[in-house]
Amino acid sequence: MNICVNSLYRLSIPQFHSLYTEEVSDEALTLLFSAVENGDQNCIDLLCNLALRNDDLGHRVEKFLFDLFSGKRTGSSDIDKKINQACLVLHQIANNDITKDNTEWKKLHAPSRLLYMAGSATTDLSKKIGIAHKIMGDQFAQTDQEQVGVENLWCGARMLSSDELAAATQGLVQESPLLSVNYPIGLIHPTTKENILSTQLLEKIAQSGLSHNEVFLVNTGDHWLLCLFYKLAEKIKCLIFNTYYDLNENTKQEIIEAAKIAGISESDEVNFIEMNLQNNVPNGCGLFCYHTIQLLSNAGQNDPATTLREFAENFLTLSVEEQALFNTQTRRQIYEYSLQ
């Protein structure tokens, strides 16, 4: 028995027995985590079972597995596939006639990281849609262009909705006091033709004033871009980060007019950084908005324009495979905020 447990799970008998008590030893968890990072399938299966626990330990293990699955934590090259396949097996067990009403399987019947990972591994479209319904519930598009249909949840070319982008970026802001991020908006109201960015700026200034780094996420119709107001040498600057084709002049002018409300006096003080980064990240504009907020929150006193331009230039030097991996992992990291 001792040899079997040690060879399967890298644990001693006492450490293995501790997994079935309320308090699992940190030593046993550390050994399991290390084995899972290296792709040990037996340990992955064991941790996925532990992640079913609806207590602090279960949530900690579930988070660890999702961090590996989403690329936040480094593991073996195929770690995401091993984890989501293990979750899929658990999901199949959770839905058989014996266990489907068992509360111990709750995480596989309600929105959770485990259910999301199981859904990503499902190839049966009807089952995939069924899982997506459990995760998303009923969602409504904020604009005509938003794709909120459940069949698109794991699609690598799905446009992020306002709610997803808001959940993820607000989650980032909680981790960094350097940025203020506003709820995503459309630039122009579809019926009244009102400049919504201007309205949001006026409301923000009236309520609390602009912070030193104020972010607005703006949809121009079918595309997200990042609008940042910041101070440099005591002067207010405006930076537009656009990861697709250059904006048309009408759109640029609407942004410039809104920027004047924030104190921008000259149009040349609105800096448009425009590079097409989306060849291998289809409909990835929202992903880049999220990622650039991450960059800005860690940039300290560095000039935001320099930070974002360097990122864009470096991204274009990545291989097709590296850009595709960015697409997959960033989508997973973003959706995690909607599961919390």
Swiss-Prot record:
GO terms for cellular component: extracellular region; host cell cytoplasm. Its EC number is 3.4.22.-. It is found in: Secreted; Host cytoplasm. Pfam families: ElaD-SseL-like_C, ElaD_SseL-like_N. Signal peptide: none annotated. The active site is at H223, C285 (nucleophile). Effector proteins function to alter host cell physiology and promote bacterial survival in host tissues. This protease targets the host cell ubiquitin pathway by acting as a deubiquitinase in infected host cells. Specifically hydrolyzes mono- and polyubiquitin substrates in vitro with a preference for 'Lys-63'-linked ubiquitin chains, suggesting that it interferes with a signaling pathway rather than inhibiting proteasomal-dependent degradation of its targets. Does not possess desumoylating activity. This is Deubiquitinase SseL. The lineage of its organism: Bacteria, Pseudomonadati, Pseudomonadota, Gammaproteobacteria, Enterobacterales.
